[in-house]
Amino acid sequence: MSFVLSRMAACGGSCKNKVTVSKPVWDFLSKETPARLARLREEHRVSILIDGETSDIYVLQLSPQGPPPAPPNGLYLARKALKGLLKEAEKELKKAQRQGELMGCLALGGGGEHPELHRPGPPPLRAAPLLPPGARGLPPPPPPLPPPLPPRLREDAEEQETTCPICLGEIQNAKTLEKCRHSFCEGCITRALQVKKACPMCGRFYGQLVGNQPQNGRMLVSKDATLLLPSYEKYGTIVIQYVFPPGVQGAEHPNPGVRYPGTTRVAYLPDCPEGNKVLTLFRKAFDQRLTFTIGTSMTTGRPNVITWNDIHHKTSCTGGPQLFGYPDPTYLTRVQEELRAKGITDD
């Protein structure tokens, strides 16, 4: 088993608080733009430590930092922000490398002590062709094609395409994932997907996750044009009602054979295009038994009850985020990220 796979297995298959990054990219980010890393740590209240390494890769671990309580879904959002920052750093590093290649080519071209002697001069003047009276000139020729990539950059790009990101060796029996088009050794990606059904490169989810929500529940949807949510006053409101009768816990629940009480939950979405998109995703999550689970209530401390399962719903029309209501400008975006983490997307 490769180092990357062993790290994934060691963190229970979820790796929710770990990120792998190539050493050159991490060194570039931490040395050239440390302020951006410091800002990410401060905004998301996390520490970022090197948890392991190979000759080419660091495994970074994110941990909550600062006084409790930690923000909801904080590690997931911090990990996503860090991956975005690393992607930007990788682009900047490649740009710097290209500029270095160009300067090296100019130096090899004979810069010497008087580089101005080697600069290309203006093109020679040419006599314009004689045209008959009234004739129009031909359109200018198309611009020349850009020069090909320097050999080293071309080799780097080809090496990336033929190197497996998991074992870091040459790809054997290449398998390309359908949605994100990342390629791996067939054996490597087969084992990786057994640990977690997501692309090790981008985190794109594959397969269908099924939860342990009680199967006897119903999701009822209605629309109220007279009920207006703050910040969405020009739209009506989608009212979602989740209804569960009492039942007995099954084998997939914490205490099989123990009874749980019934419950009814109500949630609200704006009846706008994005709100209806979230409604469609909520239906998928409910059908896959991911919206609720059975456990201990976070508000009452009562065990063996039906509880929310980390897909946040607005259970109040007003009051803002503190009272699980509106206005909350980023809620629809955040909840789609939570759904995406469970493999619920609109494609």
From Swiss-Prot:
Its keywords, alphabetically, are: Cytoplasm, Metal-binding, Notch signaling pathway, Transferase, Ubl conjugation pathway, Zinc, Zinc-finger
Return the Pro residues bias intervals.
120-151
Keyword Cytoplasm in record: yes
- Report the pathway entry: Protein modification; protein ubiquitination
> What protein does this entry describe?
Probable E3 ubiquitin-protein ligase DTX3
In the record, what terms sit under GO molecular function? transferase activity; zinc ion binding
Chain residue ranges for the region called Disordered: 111-157
